[in-house]
């Protein structure tokens, strides 16, 4: 077995070492800031794959949704289904304004879009990647690819790490920034080290509707819909996209995040009720229908869509309600009207399975927050063991919130490590 346990001697003193596990956003942010604040610290990033900053690269359709233009901590923490109370304290150390300022200082300007998401003005994730790689190079951060941590143990006041099958490294400090794993078994090396882990389940996924004819509307987007999980309190509102496999869009992703554990317990098989006109309930929509019967009496219902719904969706709802294409508003039978109102306000669809939303797929679960000091990101149980990013039991909805968690916890971990050097 190859043993790599070098100690660098400077002016008669040994240079302390930090090993960061994970070459993602949180890992890089911890590494480059620790190296910048403490030049005498040897910093090494170990990435188990051959690619660095993978989520940064694909986030936001390749533009990188760096953060969200929310400047109130009280409002920000509402975007995290798990870990909001923890982040309420963490955000006092490093928040949205700090993220914007940090990147601006390094020549990266961010812009805000109408929905609050923030991107580099270049509209390219490569801008963020280049910035982080440049910082790593500037401060001498070593990057080692295809290095998977297999075992972590404390030995003689330092950490011993078994990498791949035949390499041993030692370090004074370790920061776990390995991201989330979808299966508990993948946390084995962490659990074996005595770290308590909350059972992981997927979050931010889309819904499969394999037997639903609504899939024929692939590509149709509704600007605002309300979706409720039947038999549950889970309800969200927002843009909805119909896909060839089912439903996606911000409203579905938010629902999957807030319902991550409940939906996993149902094995991702459940029914949803979609209100395509969330400003109305069945009673108020019935009143509006009566009004339209007079206003549009001579016009064909199929040709006159008074609700602003996409035409393909409107025609689909008419078909599902048994309304003929040539039927006029004045001639709409009461039974057909009631069915159409029901389908507009509470269309029911059977969900059977999920599909990963690759751009922002996260997991609910990870290192239990009760075992982490929020002011340093250090383990309460093991000195000089730190955490950052999605490795901990924090996850946000889509919109830049998971990256803000990465920047914040990476920053706090860097400061916490340096204070112990």
Roles of regions detected by a PLM:
Residues 35-61:
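Glycine-rich FAD pyrophosphate-binding loop
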Residues 37, 49-51, 72-74, 92, ...:
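Residue-level recognition of phosphate/Mg2+-coordinating polar/acidic sites
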Residues 19-21, 149, 168-181, 190, ...:
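Short hydrophobic core segments
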Residues 173-215:
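Glycine-rich loop(s) and the adjacent beta-strand/alpha-helix scaffold that form part
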Residues 145-158:
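A conserved short coil-to-beta-strand element within the FAD-binding core of flavoproteins
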Residues 179-181, 185-188, 394-420:
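A conserved FAD-binding loop/helix module that cradles the flavin
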Residues 87-95, 115-134, 181-185, 212, ...:
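Short beta-strand to alpha-helix junction loop
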Residues 16-45, 413-417:
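N-terminal Rossmann-like FAD-binding beta1-loop-alpha1 element of flavoenzymes
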């Amino acid at each position: 077995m190859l043993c790599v346990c070098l100690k660098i001697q400077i002016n008669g003193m040994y240079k302390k070492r930090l090993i960061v596990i994970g070459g993602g956003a949180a890992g890089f942010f911890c590494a480059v800031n620790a190296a910048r604040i403490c030049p005498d610290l040897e910093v090494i990033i170990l990435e188990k794959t051959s690619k660095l900053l993978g989520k940064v690269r694909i986030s936001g359709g390749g533009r990188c949704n760096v953060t969200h233009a929310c400047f109130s901590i009280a409002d920000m923490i509402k975007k995290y289904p798990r870990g909001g109370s923890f982040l309420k304290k963490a955000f006092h150390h490093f928040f949205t304004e700090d993220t914007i300022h940090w990147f601006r200082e390094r020549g990266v300007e961010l812009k805000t879009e109408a929905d609050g998401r923030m991107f580099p003005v270049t509209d390219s994730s490569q801008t963020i990647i280049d910035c982080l790689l440049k910082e790593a190079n500037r401060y001498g951060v070593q990057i080692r690819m295809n290095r998977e941590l297999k075992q972590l143990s404390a030995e003689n006041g330092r950490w011993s790490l078994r990498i791949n099958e035949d390499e041993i490294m030692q370090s004074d400090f370790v920061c776990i920034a390995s991201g989330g794993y979808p299966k508990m078994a993948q946390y084995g090396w962490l659990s074996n080290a005595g770290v308590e882990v909350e059972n992981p389940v997927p979050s931010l996924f889309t819904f499969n509707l394999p037997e639903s004819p609504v899939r024929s509307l692939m590509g149709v987007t509704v600007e605002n819909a309300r979706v409720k999980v039947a038999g549950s309190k889970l309800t969200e509102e927002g843009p909805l996209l119909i896909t060839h496999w089912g439903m996606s869009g911000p409203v579905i992703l938010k629902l999957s995040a807030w319902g991550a554990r409940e939906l996993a317990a149902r094995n991702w098989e459940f029914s949803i009720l979609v209100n395509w006109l969330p400003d109305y309930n069945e009673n108020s929509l019935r009143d509006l229908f009566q009004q339209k019967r007079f206003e549009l009496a001579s016009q064909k219902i199929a040709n006159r869509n008074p609700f602003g719904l996409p035409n393909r969706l409107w025609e689909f709802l008419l078909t599902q309600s048994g309304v003929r294409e040539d039927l006029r508003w004045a001639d709409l039978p009461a039974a057909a009207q009631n069915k159409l109102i029901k389908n507009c306000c509470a269309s029911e669809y059977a969900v059977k399975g999920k599909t990963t939303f690759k751009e922002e797929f996260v997991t609910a679960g990870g290192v239990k927050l009760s075992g982490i000091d929020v002011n340093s990101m250090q383990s309460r149980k093991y000195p000089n063991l730190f955490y950052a990013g999605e490795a901990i039991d924090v996850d946000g909805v889509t919109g830049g919130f998971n990256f803000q968690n990465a920047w914040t916890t990476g920053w706090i971990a860097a400061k916490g490590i340096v204070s112990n050097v």
